[in-house]
From Swiss-Prot:
This is S-adenosylmethionine:tRNA ribosyltransferase-isomerase. One of its GO terms (cellular component) is cytoplasm. It catalyses: 7-aminomethyl-7-carbaguanosine(34) in tRNA + S-adenosyl-L-methionine = epoxyqueuosine(34) in tRNA + adenine + L-methionine + 2 H(+). It is found in: Cytoplasm. The gene is queA. Keywords: Cytoplasm, Queuosine biosynthesis, S-adenosyl-L-methionine, Transferase.
């Protein structure tokens, strides 16, 4: 019997060739595994067929965050090369970032287009606090964005293990992305095409939340017990019409783990914006979301634990094993799973 308290219980072996390095084209031709909790059955289909499996009048909630070109390459004054990944903006025009390359407080980093960053603090979790400057002017997030658009690249997850290409700027961005701020895509959204959304909108009400996905989403759980894990936090906001649906009795499909966490955090706090650090797992299951659409996630990640919060650990392992046997493609550019 697997112990849902132990992080090692969420481990599984994934053959490396099943890690998707590129998305399926067109996006809605990805495979879709459907797990029905009422009947304990698994159905295999393609994503385009999603609408015919959803209960009538299901309200669909998407995350409209937009992935920014958060990865930039530069050098120190000494000439040493560095790579910087913006994790999130903070107050007072400061930014939490990851830096590959040794830096200390006070180090100035130089990028193209005259952009500079000064290292202000080294944080215990391995991140750094920096301020950005251009022509000696300290930059806000909105002033930095157009420069990132010019010199930055899309921050593909580490397991994709290749440099970002021009196509990734489209492929790694939901087609309804609107509010800039994420450094990782809400990947369940990547399967939708314009045509599919237009068709579904006639049948299902659409709603949005914003949660700016941080790099912490890829962070492995290093504790031995899930109760010892310190969850990362991410900024979210929920508009009034979405709150009305959350507070109603309508059936809700969350498109992705980020939407799930946002809705469930609101249910627990009644706060329509702020920092979400909710960790859903079998010991802290969802209270409001009825159905989940998601991709296949990394072993021992908080995301596979979230899946297990819906269907239990044993079932999660069984479903994932069947997906591996059926050669589903895993992770951000991979195939999808629907929990009914």
């Amino acid at each position: 019997m697997l112990d849902p308290l132990k992080v090692d219980s969420y481990d599984y072996h994934l053959p490396p060739h099943l890690i998707a390095k590129e998305p399926v084209q067109p996006a809605d031709r990805a495979k879709l595994l459907i797990y029905d909790r009422k009947t304990d059955t698994i159905t295999h289909t393609i994503f385009k067929n999603l609408p015919q499996f959803l209960p009538q009048k299901t309200h669909i909630v998407f995350n409209d965050t937009k992935v920014i070109k958060a990865r930039i390459f530069g050098h120190k004054s000494s000439g040493g090369k560095i790579e910087l990944l913006i994790n999130r903006p903070l107050e007072n025009e400061r930014f939490n970032v990851f830096i590959r390359g040794k830096v200390k407080v006070g180090t100035t980093l130089h990028f193209s287009q005259g952009l500079q960053a000064i290292v202000e603090e080294l944080i215990e979790d391995g991140t750094r606090i920096v301020t950005f400057y251009h022509d000696e002017k300290r930059l806000s997030f909105h002033e930095l964005l157009p420069i990132l658009d010019t010199i930055g690249s899309i921050p593909l997850p580490p397991y994709i293990d290749r440099a970002a290409k021009k196509e990734d700027e489209t492929n790694y961005q939901p087609i309804f992305a609107k509010k800039a701020g994420a450094v990782a895509a809400p990947t369940a959204s990547l399967h939708f095409t314009e045509q599919m959304l237009n068709s579904m909108a006639k049948e299902f009400p659409f709603h949005f939340v914003t949660l700016h996905v941080g790099a912490g989403t890829f962070k492995p759980v290093e504790a031995n017990l899930i109760t010892e894990h310190a969850m990362h936090s991410e900024y979210y906001e929920i508009p009034k019409d979405t709150i009305e649906v959350i507070e109603s009795d309508e059936k809700v499909l969350a498109v992705g783990t980020t939407v799930t966490r946002t809705i469930e955090y609101y249910v627990r706090t009644k706060k329509s914006f702020g920092e979400c650090d909710l960790f859903l797992n079998p010991l802290n299951p969802p209270k409001r979301v009825d159905h989940l659409l998601t991709n296949f996630h990394l072993p021992k990640s908080t995301l596979i634990m979230l899946v297990a919060s819906f269907i239990g650990l044993e079932t999660t392992k069984r479903v994932y094993q069947e997906a591996i046997e059926k050669e589903y493609r895993f992770y951000s550019y991979g195939d999808a799973m629907l929990i009914l």
